[in-house]
């Protein structure tokens, strides 16, 4: 893109000022429409050091009510961020509906720096490019406006700006070794930048090259492009998104009705196995921490199937400093106002730690689907988005273990009645549980489709036969141990 880029002609000063005034006014009006329509806008500023990203950003945000936007400067990842997936620190920054988020440098800057300084090779570069493309596409598919600007200046212009900044003691601090290094290796940087821009350019979120030699002209290009992009997004906000074909390897899994639930353990067998398996898991937890391998354990299942007791037998073997259990309920207002995966990105473990989810992102294709909390296009799209999310975790190095806790309808009824008739257990049963029970067949259809479409080789499902809770608990412990041992043996 940069190598074939034709520099636009700068308008005369009078025209420039007129267009600046018009664009600033228009953006001020559009911010209210963004709020009214609930349009989330993510704006990424990338480019050469000293190209003026910060100063243009400062000019642009003067036209927006500060209650409706945030600005984040993405420096080098912190130690904590390095222990999370590559995209973690960007996904958690996405704006809520009706808000704008400006990023002064972002995922492009991180990737190209790693390439330029030989921190990643070709294979890792391609993997990160795929991650970026999936990330950006998921945002735009879910109604986000993503606008990406690259500020372009010549080698000569950059060198001149570096020298001017260095001459003034009050601005000298703004020049780091990065700018000098870029200028010295300008051609190499140009090639890497150009390749990245080409690799991540798409019709849904294209790159806009900003001629940044003149500051006012750069501001005008950004403002007019923002205005045009926002107006288009507001007009097209209700268009359905085409469904993508799944490209991830799937394994066959039986339907729930085909699974026998008569498996059980005696109390004596259960106690013996529980003690041995918990001791084994405790040892493995220490090894996980030393090897810095993250683990994500996801629980789904019927109400009263025994998820809580199952989780308790796993956590009973773990160092409390190295795990966290996340009970997932209906999304809070700030969670509902963002991409549905946002609240799960926020709860990911750091390397060496374990995150256990009691209910998960699969709510999108179960309760949200059946209760009408999302459109058919949205839940149909979610299968692929979830596979992508889990692929991101797998590529990061996470062990992903997914459990469906299965019981039959009669067993559920017996447990519901026991809860209703036992004072200390009454808090466990709600009217919603009874309503969901009435939709058993609909839920079973949805669960079977979920299992079929998301049973990937890197994040397979495990069905726990839980008519006998003791059997299910022991089976879960064995599966967790086997998965962790396999990861440690790699």
Could you tell me what each predicted segment is?
Residues 1-490:
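Glycine-rich phosphate-binding loop of ATP-dependent small-molecule kinases
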């Amino acid at each position: 893109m940069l190598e074939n880029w034709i520099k636009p002609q700068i308008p005369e000063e009078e025209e420039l000022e007129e267009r600046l005034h018009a664009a600033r006014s228009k953006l001020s009006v559009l911010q209210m429409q963004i709020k009214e329509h609930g349009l989330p806008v993510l704006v990424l500023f990338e480019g050469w050091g000293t190209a003026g990203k910060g100063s243009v950003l400062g000019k642009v945000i003067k036209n927006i009510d500060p209650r409706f936007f945030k600005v984040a400067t993405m420096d080098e990842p912190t130690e904590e961020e390095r222990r999370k997936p590559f995209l973690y620190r960007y996904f958690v920054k996405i704006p809520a509906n009706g808000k704008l988020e400006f990023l002064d440098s972002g995922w492009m800057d991180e990737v190209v720096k790693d390439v330029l300084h030989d921190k990643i090779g070709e294979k890792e570069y391609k993997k990160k490019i795929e991650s970026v493309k999936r990330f950006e596409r998921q945002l735009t598919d879910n109604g986000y406006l993503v606008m990406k600007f690259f500020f372009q200046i010549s080698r000569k212009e950059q060198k001149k700006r570096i020298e001017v900044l260095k001459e003034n003691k009050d601005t000298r601090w703004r020049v780091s070794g990065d700018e000098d290094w870029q200028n010295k290796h300008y051609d190499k940087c140009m090639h890497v930048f150009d390749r990245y821009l080409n690799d991540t350019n798409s019709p849904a979120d294209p790159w806009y090259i900003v001629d940044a030699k003149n500051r006012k002209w750069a501001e005008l290009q950004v403002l007019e492009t923002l205005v045009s992009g926002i107006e288009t997004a507001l007009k097209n906000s209700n268009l359905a998104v085409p469904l993508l074909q799944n490209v991830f390897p799937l394994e066959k899994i039986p339907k729930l009705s085909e699974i026998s639930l008569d498996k059980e353990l005696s109390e004596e067998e259960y106690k013996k196995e529980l003690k041995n398996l918990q001791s084994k898991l405790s040892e493995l937890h220490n090894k996980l921490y030393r090897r810095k391998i993250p683990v994500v354990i996801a629980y789904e299942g019927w109400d009263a199937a025994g998820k809580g007791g199952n989780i308790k037998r796993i956590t009973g073997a773990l160092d409390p400093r190295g795990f966290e259990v996340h009970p997932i309920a209906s999304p809070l207002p700030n969670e509902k106002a963002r991409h549905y995966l946002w609240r799960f990105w926020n709860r990911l473990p750091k390397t060496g730690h374990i995150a256990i989810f009691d209910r998960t992102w699969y709510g999108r294709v179960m309760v949200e689907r059946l209760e009408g909390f999302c459109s058919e296009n949205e839940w149909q799209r979610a299968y692929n988005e979830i596979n992508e999310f889990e692929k991101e975790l797998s590529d990061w190095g996470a062990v992903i273990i997914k459990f469906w806790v299965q019981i039959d309808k009669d067993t559920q009824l017996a447990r519901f009645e026991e809860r209703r008739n036992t004072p200390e257990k009454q808090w466990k049963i709600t009217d919603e549980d009874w309503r969901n029970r009435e939709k058993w067949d609909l839920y079973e259809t949805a669960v079977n489709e979920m299992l079929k479409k998301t049973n990937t080789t890197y994040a397979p499902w495990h069905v726990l036969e839980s008519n006998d809770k003791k059997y299910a608990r022991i089976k879960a412990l064995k599966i967790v141990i086997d998965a962790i041992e396999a990861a440690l043996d790699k």
